[in-house]
Amino acid sequence: MQVILLDKIAHLGNVGDQVSVKAGFARNFLIPQGKAVMATQANIEYFESRRAELERKAAEVLATAQARANQLAELATVTITSKAGDEGRLFGSITARDVAEAVTAAGVEIAKSEVRLSTGPLRTTGEHQVRFQLHGEVFATLNVVIVAE
C-alpha cells in the first residue's frame, strides 16, 4: 500500500516521502495517528500544495522537543522519595509514570510515554540514569535519585 508520510518516521522516511508499507500498518497505525495519508492522486496534489506548511510544522515540533531536552539538561537531577527496606530495596517500584510526574513537578513537562526505563521499573534506592525520547530523533538523559523515606 502506498502512503505519503506527514511526519518523520524512524526506519521509514521523512515528511513528504511516498513509501510502500503493509496494509495493516497503514490502516491501524499510520493513518489513524495522522502520520500518513493514502497516496491517491488527489492526496498527492493536495500534499504538494501544503508541503512547505507541513515541513515548517515538523520543524517547529522538533525545535520544541530540542528546547525541552535543553531544559532537562539544565535540570541535572530529580529526587524521588519512596518507602524502602534496610538494604535499599523499595517497597514497590518507581515506574515511568512516577518519573514523569517528578520531572513535571520540577518544571519540565514530560509525558510518561516519553520516559524510557531500559531495565524496567526502578526497584532500588540510589542514583539511576533515565533516558527520555522527546521526539523521533531527540533524546535526553537525566539522573534520578531515589531516597528512602
From Swiss-Prot:
An MF annotation (GO) of this entry: structural constituent of ribosome
Role noted for this protein: Binds to the 23S rRNA.
InterPro entries: Ribosomal_bL9, Ribosomal_bL9/RNase_H1_N, Ribosomal_bL9_bac/chp, Ribosomal_bL9_C, Ribosomal_bL9_C_sf, Ribosomal_bL9_N, Ribosomal_bL9_N_sf
PANTHER family: 50S RIBOSOMAL PROTEIN L9
Gene Ontology biological-process annotations: translation
Domain of life assignment: Bacteria
Organism: Histophilus somni (strain 2336) (Haemophilus somnus)
Protein family: Belongs to the bacterial ribosomal protein bL9 family.
Matching HAMAP family: Ribosomal_bL9
Protein name in the entry: Large ribosomal subunit protein bL9
Keywords: Ribonucleoprotein, Ribosomal protein, RNA-binding, rRNA-binding
